[in-house]
Amino acid sequence: MMTDPKFIDVDGIRTRYFEKGSGEVLLLVHGSHFGTPDACESALDWEYNFDALAQSFRVIAMDKLGQGYTGNPKTDADFTMAATVKHAARLIETLGLKNVHVIGHSRGGYVVARLTLDHPELVRSCVIIDSGTLAPGPSKTEYIMKEAPKPRLSRESQRWCIEHYSFRPDHITQAWLDEAENIAKSTKYQETVRKMEDEGLKSKQFFTHLAVHKEETLNWIIQGKLTQPTLLIWGYNDPTAELKRGQMLFELIADANPNSEMHIINRAGHFCYREQPETFNQVIKGFVEKCAGSK
């Protein structure tokens, strides 16, 4: 169970995280972004993995900038992916960590990849999970999510969105929905929705900035700047970040980084780490132990 959350000040942002275990340090970074009308993700996304991984490692699961119970960006100019990456890096530094195995899902996968490029001195290895944000090619997310029931961000609508990201919706727990529903109702989160959706920061700034940032990130990968051991994990049945896009991303990484590999999890959608947690946890355990042994 993910209980006893901790809070720390990261450059003036009150940041929530969970911590358990000892040994090699794993930082778990969830997906989505601030102000999304689909589903409110948080550190609790890792509820199937946290305790299992903490049996072997020191595991830290964070709420990203403006998500979960972490504070919002301090200025409108910080409603960007670059600010999200910087916040995650500063959390590592504020906690006094180094040689961290960074593990990110979806938008969080983009965060850990870019963090590894920006701050290689902080990172021992990088794990990218079903990250349509980082992968080349168009996403199907907007097309699928436009059918979500209204009102958006209601408990029922969030369940629908998560189900349509998934191959096996039985991974959706009441505790997870409780968390998502409570976050959606918070004044803090409603402010991000207002800024991103109503005031147009999503289209005017977030996505335009992300397009430029992503192009730079992929170019750096092609140029061989991602040198840490890197693992891609992908759900074979992901309906939004399709496997073929994951394979395209792996080709870019593998051509430039010999210390890279990819693991495909069958009968799993976008939330492969929740839909097939035992398989996922074993893959992570093996990869981290191999990386730790090669120091």
Short names for language-model regions:
Residues 158-171, 179-187, 207-211:
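Helix-loop "lid/cap" segments that line or gate small-molecule binding pockets
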Residues 104, 108, 112:
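Gly/Ala-rich beta-loop-alpha elbow adjacent to hydrolase catalytic centers
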Residues 189-251, 261:
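Conserved serine/cysteine hydrolase catalytic core
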Residues 113-117, 124-160:
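Flexible "cap/lid" loop of the alpha/beta hydrolase fold
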Residues 256-295:
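Catalytic active-site module of serine/aspartate enzymes centered on a nucleophile-bearing elbow/loop
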Residues 13-71:
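Conserved HGGG/HGGXW glycine-rich cap/lid loop of the alpha/beta-hydrolase fold
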Residues 45-51, 61-103, 282:
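Active-site loop/oxyanion-hole signature of alpha/beta-hydrolase fold enzymes
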Residues 32, 236-238, 267-269:
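Acidic beta-to-alpha connecting loop that harbors the catalytic carboxylate
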